[in-house]
Regions:
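Bacterial Sec-dependent N-terminal signal peptides
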Residues: 1-24
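Short active-site neighborhood of thiol/selenol oxidoreductases, capturing the structured segment around
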Residues: 50-73, 182
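Structural microenvironment flanking redox-active thiols in thiol-disulfide oxidoreductases
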Residues: 73-118, 129-135
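N-terminal "domain-start" segment that seeds a small globular fold
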Residues: 21-52
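Loop/turn elements at helix/coil->beta-strand transitions in domains of secreted/extracellular proteins
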Residues: 57-59, 88-93, 120-124, 142
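Short, thiol/selenol-centered motifs that function as redox-active sites or metal-ligating centers
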Residues: 66-75, 145, 201-204, 208
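Short, internal strand/loop/helix patches
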Residues: 112-154
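Thiol-/selenol-based redox modules, centered on thioredoxin-like
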Residues: 147-208
Length: 208
């Protein structure tokens, strides 16, 4: 009887301890197959931009990026190249700065304008004012890629992650994840690698 009481006591404490442990939170944001909603954000040219403006587009290369992050800077030329090649076949680049400029003034809208002019961006560079868009996507880094395709269901998420397997040096790229995904969509084939880890700087959020 003593053994039974002891066993019940041990089981009780295990149960209480398990209840006290925080549950693992599911990552929020879009997953492969999710349907992305549209947004309307200000571009560096002063115009408001939404995805519905692109009637002839087959989809979009959404890239969360910023002005100051060395990983973002290292990928700017790659984004320009991707935009120049793939917007002609229906997949333009849409870049979005998700950072709060109150945390890092280098990410201000004014400095976005300067950066876009200096680098010669061929794509819209939008400011996520109020930080409402990036949480919907689930972006955590800059740069962070979301490849969308127009389907009967809506804008379907087809690829999430990095542009390629070299976050800094383009000369060391051996796997081009985003290009492979785009080419698969254009060829009507299944994407082999649908998700990779985004490598970059954490998105700067005002936690006050």
């Amino acid at each position: 009887m003593k053994y039974l009481a002891l066993l019940l006591t041990i089981l009780f404490f295990f149960q209480v301890d398990a209840m006290a442990q925080p549950t693992k939170k599911e990552p929020s944001g879009y997953k492969i197959g999710s349907i992305a909603t549209d947004f309307k954000l200000q571009n560096v040219d002063g115009n408001m931009v939404s995805l519905q403006d692109y009637e002839k587009a087959k989809g979009f290369i959404i890239c969360f990026t910023c002005n100051h992050c060395p990983f973002s800077i290292a990928n700017e030329s790659r984004l320009i190249s991707l935009d120049e090649r793939y917007k002609e076949v229906g997949y333009p680049v849409i870049a979005i700065n998700p950072n709060d400029p109150a945390i890092n003034e280098d990410d201000s809208f004014e400095k976005m304008i300067t950066r876009a002019e200096e680098k010669g961006f061929t794509f819209p560079y939008l400011f996520d004012e109020g930080q409402r868009v990036f949480p919907q996507y689930g972006a955590t880094k800059t740069p962070h890629i979301y490849l969308l395709q127009k389907t009967k269901k809506g804008l379907e998420v087809k690829y999430i992650g990095a542009i390629d397997n070299s976050s800094r040096d383009e000369d060391e790229v051996t796997e081009r994840y985003l290009e492979d995904a785009l080419n698969a969509l254009l060829d009507g084939k299944e994407i082999e690698v649908k998700e990779t880890k985004a490598i970059g700087c954490s998105i700067k959020v005002d936690k006050s």
